[in-house]
């Protein structure tokens, strides 16, 4: 893990092929269904030990939807944080929670008042989401609000100090930091939301071009002629105009791999996309100095 950390950091700091060497675990699957199935098998293997926690970290929330559906089908408990910070339900939750927090309290955080706040937020859930497929946003945010109120008991100082802690957290939309205290062994979230958090194991799926990196890098990269594309792979060639975009994407990858305490697992598939074209592996997998090592869950997770 240390060598991988240094290699990715070197690419983030120096816009050129690295002289460092590192390896990463990568499973190459045949299609989307096989990739999702493999990820679920890994999750099941990891959580068979109650002391383990695992996060599936995606570049964009939509990339985790099929994994969430399979977890639901399998009856595997997980915390769903695939929502975006600009989702209307996400923003509405904060508006309602902050308003009801102020209504229920008078400058002091007393647990009786905090429970009244929770009931008031629950009563207004119809304002926060209208579509059934967005209910998970309310449920997840509500759970984080409950945890915030519980964790506020540990804040040193008076009830006013606890009030200010809660008010600051809600005012700065900081509930995601409460994910550190959730009970679920499995977390499904974006890399962006995972900043500052850690899990024993991290799975990073969908390491494809136009997924990770996103189209915001891949489209201009093609226009700039900064990639060598094969049938199912892409290699980055460091055109000067792509420097900013590349550094942003490699920095996101760095955040993802450094969320793991024990190990990080990558997956990719080169099946057909929705236009019936073969998907390419990400250029981030084809960096000079990075060795890709195949793996099976049972040989690593004991």
Feature-to-residue mapping (PLM):
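Conserved helicase motor
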Residues: 61, 82-88
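Helicase P-loop NTPase motor core
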Residues: 1-78
